[in-house]
Amino acid sequence: MKKILYFMMLAASVAVLTCCSAEDPFEEFVDNGNDSWNGGGMQTNGNSATIGELTTFDVAIDRTTAEPTEAATAYLPDEEDALEDNDFTTEVSIDLSNPVAKTENGVEVTVSGGHVTANHGSEKKVCYVVSGTTANGSLTILGEKKYAVKLSGASITNPDSAALNLLSGKRAFIILTDGTTNTLADGTGGSQKGALYCKGKLLFNGSGTLSVTGNSNNGIHSADYIAFNKGNNIYVKSTANHGIKANDGIYINGGILNVEVTAAAAKGINCESNIIVNGGRTTVLTTGDGMYDTDDREAKGAAGIKADSALTVNGGELWLKNTGSGGKGINVDMEARFNGGSVYVITKGGQYKSNNDTSSPKGIKADGNITVSGGRIWVRTSGYNGEGIETKKELSITGGEVASYAYDDAVNSKSTMTISGGYVYAQGQHNDGLDANGNCYIKGGTVYAICSGSPEVAIDANTEGGYKLYLTGGTVVAVGGLENGSQLSQSCYQSSWSANTWYALTVGSNTFSFQTPSSGGTGLVVSGASQPTLQSGVSISGGTAYFGGLGISGGTVSGGSSVSLSTYTSGSGMGGGPGGGGPGGWR
């Protein structure tokens, strides 16, 4: 898998940005080896994005073991789920290269060819130490008590069923022995639910590596919940269905987790309940196209992460890329909460159509509310009808950084949209920047929105449905103006603008500098807590970079010329027609 550069963003930039390039403003941030500006004065090799590349960053499988330092407190549903609170002192060794039937420490081990079954019955504190290789075998665990499976250089391939079949129904602690490589794979035959199947809770620990390949169904499947913890280095691939599947919850507390799926409408990480991400680095690649579900009678697309309940991101990193038609990066049936961490999403496929139904590509989609209070979210969609961030209900941003560069609407809510803090960038290549189908409230934060051109607008609300844009606070830059009928409690000002140019907007003692796109809507609207001043053609040194270097807070501004600002009032001719254009396909 091709490696790409990942440049970490620091708070203070030491680079100097120059203005008035004749090229597209994004092109100067394309990776040029070690000379790329990163908005933080530091360059490090790794995987995924390059700061300054909102429109060009990539996502690739990265099995390097260095975990992100940013992490929230680990979450486990039950105190018994912590390995350190358990004592598995009764070890039973199983060598799959030369399996031996035996009864040891109350554990019965039976062997049939390369297939091994171990039953610890009512014995407590049992730890199976598994090593060796089998190309036509399996390991099945039975028992009435919780247990541990320590993988210490085990390689299991079962052409006919699951490679590791944990049928106890009790807690299963998978311990990846440090310094060992372990592999599990099934074949294309059989009715197994996964190459690694667990009937009970599945809890990963240890700092070894594990590769799981599902060729018949899922890669890893638990009928209960799954927890990944710091130190894990796990790669999962499925050519037939989902990568990782859990019925009752998925909790990513740390570790390195890489997932690839290729089947139509398959999900990289799929949970029938809640998903919580607190740490680690999770990378998911999905390549399957959409498909028509004859049972549900609807078109469906693949997704990097799919939660049937809620998704919460508190820390760590998510890197998601979907190249199939109708695909999503994140698809949540209930609420999506982003409290911290970093989320990077790419979708490349276009809309999928079948049987008079459609599945449209989305970076992040939630049927419930979306709330952002911290962290960083970058989204890019390039396929036809692809929206960046979409909720069927309300959107609330109170902090963090949100940047969406989308084919269709960059950020869309079916109901109310409220921005009261944070830094928000929204560029719709063929539609609005921010689009609320209810009221849109901007109360604080810094908002930089760009639309494609008339009749679209940078910031839109559903005036046709009787709703409005209410601007009462914050710092606002809108390339393409505001929807007609806006209620502007905070004064707004307008001017013309030049493409590919750096501007500095100063409000009181605070300066926000931004680079304009190569094309966009007519007219520029700006607003701040007090009357702003605007300069064009400036250079900026220092400051804090946002949106991949397209916006800078603070820093030292030099050069340029003053821009004449005139008062902007709603309906003054810059905004588009009736707002609140319908979302580009809810599914």
Name every feature range the model reports, one short phrase each.
Residues F7-A12:
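Sec-dependent N-terminal signal peptides
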